[in-house]
Amino acid sequence: MKNNLLTFGTILAIGFFTLTANAQTAQTTSAAAGARLVKPMTITKTADLNFGTINVGTGLIGTVALSTAGTNTYTGGVTAGTIAGTITNAAYNVTGTKNATYVVTLPADNTVTVEESGGTTMKINTFTALSASGATATHTALGADTFKVGATLLVAAGQATGIYAGTFNVSVDYN
């Protein structure tokens, strides 16, 4: 009888472990793999930023805001110059992967200064960009786009007259 119980217990244990092993069978699934390769972007300046000729008052600070459409708005102690001057947006050509969107990075406020030969300076703030493709800068089906940059020139009360010049950086990258 003891042998029968031992044999019965062994059979029962083998059956239990067999059922347990079946409950833990391996499962397999698959995942997609891929990559998107993009062309390096290029940026080429085609025009410089120029606020044109400005008449400066003596007692008031002023601003000259150059829109991305190429028009100036004057406030405070400055008005449009009476001597001919050219108003231009900074303009750029961009190339890259066709139909890809990108972002334009412009200077932060109070980081760009223009200076005249006597050492007097002015700040340029509120840089804005507008792509030819609209609010979201996007390369065409040929992988090209253009954009213009506007900004605001801050003119101090009694600002020294002269020709002011400076530089600023613009960069582009894929979204």
Explain the meaning of each model-derived region.
Residues 7, 19, 170-171:
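Short, low-complexity polar/charged micro-motifs in intrinsically disordered terminal tails
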Residues 10-11, 21:
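Cleavable N-terminal signal peptides
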Residues 17-24:
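Sec/Tat signal peptide C-region and signal peptidase I cleavage site
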Residues 22, 128-130, 138:
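Serine/threonine-rich, low-complexity intrinsically disordered segments
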Residues 24-106, 139-175:
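N-terminal small/polar-rich segments of proteins
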Residues 94-133:
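Contiguous segments within soluble domain cores/interaction surfaces
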